[in-house]
């Protein structure tokens, strides 16, 4: 099976002294040189695997990347379901259908929606509507939505009610 292009790239940095974690998103359309050709960074994994992704992200940010964590859509959905879903405020209408991927995204602006794993995937992946409208700054605004979502996930994971679900989350991550 052909490897697919990477949907989202996030560098996590943990400072053991301050015990703070920082997340930096790399826009999927960032242009990099791969094999002497200018390509989008989201092509790096299918071309050169983890090694190439680590190298390119490290070069862009001027850091050494020690580890790579890969989460496919199934794992993503499983993690969100394991923590009981996430509540998100929808800041703009989201209406997109891609029957080829069985992807159907329909959220209304102004609503707070409880996202189970499938709905969370839809929210996380949304970039534009069927009519071409969408985020003014494309992937940069998509990253902002993703960061809000990730912050909500972190808050929930750190909550007392979720601590009891750590074993099932670890099991999903080990797949």
Features from the language model and the residues they span:
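Non-catalytic, solvent-exposed segments at the cell envelope interface
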Residues: 1-175
């Amino acid at each position: 099976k052909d490897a697919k292009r990477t949907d989202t790239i996030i560098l996590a940095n943990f400072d053991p002294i301050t015990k703070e974690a920082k997340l930096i998103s790399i826009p999927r359309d960032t242009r990099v040189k791969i094999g002497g050709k200018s390509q989008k960074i989201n092509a790096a994994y299918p071309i050169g695997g983890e090694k190439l992704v680590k190298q390119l992200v490290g070069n862009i940010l001027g850091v050494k990347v020690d580890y790579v964590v890969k989460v496919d859509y199934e794992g993503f959905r499983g993690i969100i379901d394991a923590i009981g879903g996430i509540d998100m405020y929808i800041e703009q209408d989201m209406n997109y259908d891609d029957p080829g991927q069985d992807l159907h995204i329909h959220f209304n602006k102004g609503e707070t929606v409880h996202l189970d794993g499938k709905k969370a995937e839809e929210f996380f992946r949304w970039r534009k509507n069927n009519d071409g409208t969408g985020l003014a700054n494309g992937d940069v605004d998509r990253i902002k939505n993703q960061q809000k979502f990730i912050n909500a996930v972190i808050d929930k994971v750190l909550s007392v009610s979720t601590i009891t679900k750590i074993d099932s989350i670890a099991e999903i991550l080990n797949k």
